[in-house]
Amino acid sequence: MSSPDFNTLPLTDLGNAERLAARFGHRLRHCHLWNRWLQYDGARWATDDTGEIHRLAATTARLLLDEARDLAQLAQAAEELERQRLIDVVEATVKWAKRSEGVARINAMVELARSRPGIPVRPEEMDSDPWLFNAVNGTIDLRTGDLQPHDPQDLITKLAPVQYDPEARY
């Protein structure tokens, strides 16, 4: 999902899932067959064994208050009729933000985010390029021997605990 105007997203569980995907989707994937969340750690896609997805969902819920603040600033500069409409939206957003911090809303956000565009991944997509070898300091293209920066688009889950040194000799 491209960066939306968060104030246009609905104040619903699905709207919250869209917010989560828009804010953090670049570092989140979900594999339905594995029933696992994966998070990109800067070098590889690792299984979320610590509940990071729920922390990101909680952050998303808290950021609803920033959306309300932004709307309140717009309301101050608006004409009277538009100002009242924006004030009503601010009040609804603050109320929704408080409700969104509950466990049911957090779990709903996480559940619905699993299928948002860009989030689902199939097992066969992971580690699918046999010519990429992931080292601590980058990914080696085994066809060329070139070291390239880690890239989440490579969908690599493995990380060899070694530094690649192109000058090394055996």
At which residue positions do the language-model features occur?
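Intein modules and their embedded homing endonuclease domains
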Residues: M1-Y170
